[in-house]
Amino acid sequence: MPVRQLPEIIVNRIAAGEVVERPASVVKELVENAIDAGSSRIDIFSDGGGRRKIVIADDGSGMTAADLALAVDRHATSKLDDEDLLQIRTLGFRGEALPSIGAVAKLSITTRHASEPHAWTLRVEGGDKTPIAPAALSQGTRVEVADLFFATPARLKFLKTDRTEAEAIREVVRRLAMARPDIAFTLAGEERAPVTWAAALPGAPGQLIRLGDILGADFRANAIEVRAEREGVVVEGFAASPALTKANALGQYLFVNGRPVRDKLILGAVRAAYSDYLPRDRHPVVALFVTLDSREVDANVHPAKTEVRFRNAGLVRALIVHALKDGLAREGRRTAANSAGSVISTFRPASMPPANWDWRASPSYPVGGSAAPSFAERAQAAFDVGAPSADIRPTEVTPDLLDRPLGAARTQIHETYIVSQTRDGLIVVDQHAAHERIVYERLKASLEANGVQRQILLIPDIVEMDEATVERLVARGEELAKFGLVIESFGPGAVAVRETPSLLGKTDAGGLLRDLAEHMAEWDEALPLERRLMHVAATMACHGSVRAGRVLKPEEMNALLREMEATPNSGQCNHGRPTYVELTLTDIEKLFGRR
């Protein structure tokens, strides 16, 4: 078969396959055009998941009759100069959206420019263009798209249900609305009540209002403002505290020069920044806006313009990690779970105990004997734990302690949780999780300073394990030594532990080494050294922390609370779980139906 030139209508339909994947793609392209036109209000309507009808109306600059005639031709655009491809400042620039839509649907455009005496309208059906004609419209542009993919019916087979396609449209509009809080958006149709996001003032306060309207009150309540700038690159936005997480990464909204994007580099940076705060199966909620010189980023990677390529990707990633870590650390204990609402929802009215119930027989009632001894003394511990603990009974509270953020310890329950009293409520602390974070932060600080102090064992601990595990540990010996854990091979199937971190005091060297070996087996060889060291620190902190089931004296409990107040990120343990839960008096009164 000889080589021949394809007809223009076929070329447009092929191009439409890249630009118009589904109804949401149409909405994205048309709303971006409205934003580029300087609109202050954009109304979106869809029906049948966008298959039957899509309408986008704006109050932007509109088009003249001459511009309208050219707008539906391929690669006709007002947004790009002859040699300006490396300095793209608009959301759209290819000049492909309108001709691509017109090639596969019934497209109608009505527009009015301020210089024109009246509006003009133009129709394109399956690539066939009609002459422009006068029309009635006060201002801006109104675009209607009907019977999407009627000219390419095979594409209809790949669309999802109307409900799914409508949700995809909603998500596209949400992302564009996040990027431009100064523009009012209305989304209607699909037999739903219209949703309106009013225009907000520019700057961070307006941005947070818009994000709260879209992402919900929980995000607004947990939002932490972040910002960092270096070498002309600015990262700003809001990140939710670790108290608000999702089971997937769908709550991460990323924008580059105002353009919503999906970028693995940025997603990886977000994950790295939260690595000290969240479990592996939870994901943070963030809205980050990266602004940089348009010459430093390539938006012309894909026809849909959802992917970008940075000239200095390392700088962007480092800046995102720095901005998020700085914001989370700055908030300190506020990153703890503000879970009073969820706690209250789990309570149910209690039934009265049977009449013959004997409170003396309750397992929680101490019957004779002394309390168990406290955990072993540690060389740099936050509090003295050398003597046996006293009986657990409510302690005297001094007024000044009630004013401290974590209040005054009143008692310990189930030998695991510390109950403290504040001026306006109470706090329940998980003693192991809290101390684990304290030890972890100390290990990190020591590593960044002069290294972790070691204690030499008079008699080395000999730990037996399989040869593969021994090889794995010895191979990482240099990294372990940075944390004060000095080991060496002791014949086949054994490791000698000669020094341990002073922070850990007396520790189970065998258990620690086995846990470290298990984690090392999961490491990817490409995992950066810093990440590997943090994994080691987290494992050591877990082993060096006070365990559940250890009875604490009142002064020990208060010392732990004070250490938490002075420790960064003490709201979560190293695995991302909350270290304490706070209940205000209002919350408690709700439990008893007083409010």
UniProtKB/Swiss-Prot annotation:
User: Which is an annotated GO molecular function term of this record?
Assistant: ATP hydrolysis activity
Coiled-coil ranges (or none): none
Q: Which InterPro entries did the record assign?
A: DNA_mismatch_repair_CS, DNA_mismatch_repair_MutL, DNA_mismatch_S5_2-like, HATPase_C_sf, MutL/Mlh/PMS, MutL/Mlh/Pms-like, MutL_C, MutL_C_dimsub
Q: Mention one GO biological process in which this protein takes part, according to its record.
A: mismatch repair
Q: Which UniProt keywords apply?
A: DNA damage, DNA repair
- A Pfam family that this protein carries is HATPase_c_3
Query: Could you say which protein family the record assigns here?
Result: Belongs to the DNA mismatch repair MutL/HexB family.
Q: What is this protein called?
A: DNA mismatch repair protein MutL
Q: Species name for this entry?
A: Rhodopseudomonas palustris (strain TIE-1)
The gene is: mutL
